[in-house]
Amino acid sequence: MDIKKLSSLAHCAKTRSIVSLFDQKERANDFSLSTSHLYLDYSKQNITDVELEQLIEIAEDVGLSESITGQFNGDKINNTEGRSVLHTILRAPQVIKQQILGDTLANEVEAAELQMAKVVNDVQKGILTSHTGQRFTDVLAIGIGGSYYGVKVSLSALEHYRDLALSVHVIANVDGGALEEKLKTLNFETTLVVVISKTFTTQETMLNAKAVKQWMLSCASVKDLELNNVPLIIEKQWFAVSSNIEAAKEFGINIKHILPMWDWVGGRFSIWSTVGLPLALAIGNDNFNKLKQGAYEMDVHFKSTDFKNNMPVIMALLGIWNRNALEYPTLAILPYAHSLRALPGYLQQTDMESNGKSVSKSGDKLSWLTAPVVFGQEGTNGQHAFMQLMHQSDDIIPTDFIVALKGRSQYTENHKVLVANCFAQSEALMQGKTLTQVESELEMSALSTAEISLIAPHKTMKGNTPSNTLVMDLLTPETIGSLLALYEHKIFVQGVLWQVNSFDQWGVELGKQLGTRILSAIDGAEDDLLSASSQSLIARFRARSNVTPSV
């Protein structure tokens, strides 16, 4: 990436007012894009059409078109693990699967999809029941990372489409307190468990799975024990999504209840695969297919649209502009929809785990920064938390506002106020308020000149904060599919420009390795290579972990 070119382009932008860009009368129209389900207004970004054209040239120079083609065609773009990146193929028609995967693998994928659809159908119709013959009332999905965040964000986003007779819960954290609280609400005789782990060795997932298994077996009745039904509890009520079939079988899961995973589907992009089983159980096969259809439509847009009108490409270039040219280190994700409350957390993982790197694909140290720090919260809650800092600190925090124009609640006035707040915040972040404006307002009050001089500086707001506003008509499976695919592609494009491998996550591994060592030390093993700080903390834990809490 030509970082010098970016820096020279940004020279004027750093002292320019975004408001002044609206002297161009057609700016709102010219700096907006539409797809079949989404509308993007990026006119409040601090960028001109000339600068955007220069960014597009940079994208062309690094071979973005070829990279897009390579990803969709199955090139092994995850070079550190020697893998293709083909989550997109899972939402494509079967004929495309056959073209890219070949008949054998395409048929294997289709068989897995049909197996999953049958499970969903049989559970929802009461054909597949618990070991006591009862219909399932709850699904407990156990996973972590991509097998958690994707399911969680989709479940909340599509909560209005959920089967009311079947409650789906997701557990990820290894904290036993979270699991204990969840199990208190469940009936073991009517709970279906789905364990999601590619290797079936993930520490957090397997600890939680073993704890749930122990809970279920401890709940077994005397009659179950007399009839030797205990193995049936796991055999009939548990499913696994894994590539390690033998480990799942050894755990006690029926071979017919094991759905496959593939190494060319990364965890944080896996909701479109069999990992989506808990979601499909919640919303049904038809809606799950609509989710994939919405994503596929975004795929087609991404592959076939010129860069200037390509929504993922434009969002990616704007992110590059803000991160590397204007040097803003953060990105706020502010969905003005309670159903999208899990989106900021999902994008934290998808964005920062993908592009939070400092070496190129070839292993060279990069001379530019990569992924921003992503944070956010649902609106309007965020307005009463971190928005104070966004308005009045010296930090500029680029923001993505996301809103649905139509609500599903009977409280239509509430939704109108919600949308108004979304639009108002994007305007306020851009406009700000000068000292002169504040003083003029205060002069209309009964305050003295001295009081105005004291108060006025505290009411000024810097403004000039860039933002996107992403709009959809209504939260539907299709729009959510398009939204998730949009961010997937945006992150991929940024990875291409930053020249990083967006599909590995070696930074996660060091903590795992040290976690194993520290666990051994807690259990009594000596490890002189650990720091004095860690050894002291371990000693404190060993001395006090069995102390009865005073409260």
UniProtKB/Swiss-Prot annotation:
Disulfide bonds: none annotated. Pathway: Carbohydrate biosynthesis; gluconeogenesis; Carbohydrate degradation; glycolysis; D-glyceraldehyde 3-phosphate and glycerone phosphate from D-glucose: step 2/4. One of its GO terms (cellular component) is cytosol. The active site is at residues 353, 384, 512. It comes from the Bacteria. PROSITE patterns: P_GLUCOSE_ISOMERASE_1 (PS00765), P_GLUCOSE_ISOMERASE_2 (PS00174), P_GLUCOSE_ISOMERASE_3 (PS51463). It is found in: Cytoplasm. It catalyses: alpha-D-glucose 6-phosphate = beta-D-fructose 6-phosphate. It is an enzyme of class 5 (isomerase). GO terms for molecular function: carbohydrate derivative binding; glucose-6-phosphate isomerase activity; monosaccharide binding. It holds the Pfam family PGI. One of its GO terms (biological process) is glucose 6-phosphate metabolic process. Keywords: Cytoplasm, Gluconeogenesis, Glycolysis, Isomerase. Its EC number is 5.3.1.9. InterPro entries: G6P_Isomerase, G6P_Isomerase_C, Phosphoglucose_isomerase_CS, SIS_dom_sf, SIS_PGI_1, SIS_PGI_2. HAMAP family: G6P_isomerase. Belongs to the GPI family. Catalyzes the reversible isomerization of glucose-6-phosphate to fructose-6-phosphate. This is Glucose-6-phosphate isomerase 2. The lineage of its organism: Bacteria, Pseudomonadati, Pseudomonadota, Gammaproteobacteria, Alteromonadales.
